[in-house]
Amino acid sequence: MIEKLEELRAQWRKLQQEVENPSLFSSTQSYRERMRDHAYLSRLMEEYDRYLLTEKQLEDAHVLIQDESDADFKDVIRQEIRTLEAALHTSQKRLKTLLIPPDSLQEKNIIMEIRGGTGGDEAALFAADLFRMYTHYAESKQWRYEVLAVSETELGGFKEITFSISGRDVYGSLRYESGVHRVQRVPSTEASGRIHTSAVTVAVLPEMEETEVDIRAEDVRVDVMRASGPGGQCVNTTDSAVRLTHLPTGIVVVCQDEKSQIKNKAKAMRVLRSRVYDLEESKRQVARARERKSQVGSGDRSERIRTYNFPQNRVTDHRVRVTLYKLDAVMQGALDDIIEPLCIASRESVI
C-alpha cells in the first residue's frame, strides 16, 4: 500500500504543477478533469500524511518507553501508545477506502424525485417535509437547488416534486437516498391521536449533459397544455405547460412551473436525459446490480431504506443499522450522521 501511495504522491505533485498552469483554462473539459483528479489526490495525500505522522509518533513512543524507568510515566506512555495504535488503524482503513478510485458519477449534479406513496394526504405532506430536509442539507453544503416540476395538494403537500441539486460531490453524497422512506406519526388531521404509517418514494438520478445522452429529436413527442394547480384547477391562460414523451422507452416528463413554454421544455429535457440515462444504465450494467446487493442495500426504489418515527424522535436507516434519536435535527437537514456511514459502507464493500 505504501508503494502505491508514494506513486500517487508523485502524480499529485505533477498534477499540482499542471493546475497552476494558466493554459489549462483553455479547455473546459480538461480543466474539470484535472481539478477533479487533483481534489481526489489532495484528500488522499492529506490522509496519507496523517498516517505517516501517527506512525512516526508511535515509533517514538515505543523508543521512549524502553528508555523510561519511572513506572507512572510508563503508564502514561502505554496509554498514549494505545491511542496512537487506534488512530493508526483508523487512518489505515480510511486510506484503503480512499485508494478505491472515485466513481465517474461521483461529482455529478443530481435530479431528485420525491413522490407521495401509501398514506394519501399524509404521504404528500411528508414528501414536502423530505423536500425541505434535502434543501436544508443542500444549503448547509453551499449547494444550489432548483425546482423543476411540482404537483401540490390542497393541504400543502406534494403528490410529487422534481428538483435539481448542484455543487461539489452531490451525487456521491446523496446517491443512497433512493428508496422508500417510511414515516410514523400522528397526522395533524387525526382527532383521535392515532399514529399513522405512510410512505414516500425518493429517486436520485445523476444529471447528464446533452453530450452524454443521445436523445434524437424524432424520438421525443412534445405536447403543450395549460398549467394546472392543486385540485386540477387551471392556473394559466396560455399553453405554457410541456409534456415530453420519449417514444423508445415510454418515459413521460411534465413541467409547468415556468410561465414560458421554452423554459418548461428546457427543464423537462434535463429530467428526461437523466431518466433515460438511468434506465439504460440499469439495464446494461451488471456491476451496478452487484452494487445494489452490497451492504448499503439494493438501490431498488421499492426497497424500504429508512423509517422516521416522530413520537420517539427516532430515525433508523435499515441498510447500515444506524439509529439516531434526533429526528428533529435530521428533518432540519442534519444528515451527515446518516449519509457518512452509507458512503463508508459502500466503499468498504468493494475493498
From Swiss-Prot:
InterPro entries: PCRF, Pep_chain_release_fac_I, Pep_chain_release_fac_I_sf, Prokaryotic/Mito_RF, RF-1. Belongs to the prokaryotic/mitochondrial release factor family. SUPFAM superfamilies: Release factor (SSF75620). This is Peptide chain release factor 1. The keyword Cytoplasm applies. One of its GO terms (cellular component) is cytoplasm. Methylated by PrmC. Methylation increases the termination efficiency of RF1. PANTHER family: LD18447P. It comes from Treponema pallidum (strain Nichols). Its main location: cytoplasm. Keywords: Cytoplasm, Methylation, Protein biosynthesis. One of its GO terms (molecular function) is translation release factor activity, codon specific. It is found in: Cytoplasm.
